[in-house]
Curated annotation (Swiss-Prot):
Gene field: SCYGR5
UniProt entry keywords in alphabetical sequence: Keratin, Repeat
Organism (species): Homo sapiens
Location of region: 10 X 2 AA repeats of CG: 4-69
Lineage of origin: Eukaryota, Metazoa, Chordata, Craniata, Vertebrata
Assigned protein family: Belongs to the KRTAP type 28 family.
Protein name: Small cysteine and glycine repeat-containing protein 5
Length: 85
């Protein structure tokens, strides 16, 4: 199916899946860009995805020690309100 970008995020590199019919199936996002149709960017912290992860965090939110790295959460339980004070 190839890859698709979401809004202003541009295209995706090779190796990512998902179709382009809906941004809910787009699995590749670029660092530093986000749009209203990037669902994984809608978390307690906001921010943007660099990999197809559950939730994204700003780097300033990632000092809670709950699995955040390189500006993004690596697991579903990472992005909780208490994590992003």
């Amino acid at each position: 199916m190839g890859c698709c970008g979401c809004g202003g995020c541009g295209g995706c590199g090779g190796g990512c899946g998902g179709g382009c019919g809906s941004c809910t199936t787009c699995r590749c996002y670029r660092v530093g860009c986000c749009s209203s149709c990037c669902p994984c960017c809608r978390g307690c912290c906001g921010g943007c995805c660099s990999t197809p992860v559950i939730c994204c965090c700003r780097r300033t939110c990632c000092s809670c020690g709950c699995g955040c790295g390189k500006g993004c959460c690596q697991q579903k339980g990472c992005c909780q309100k208490q994590c992003c004070c």
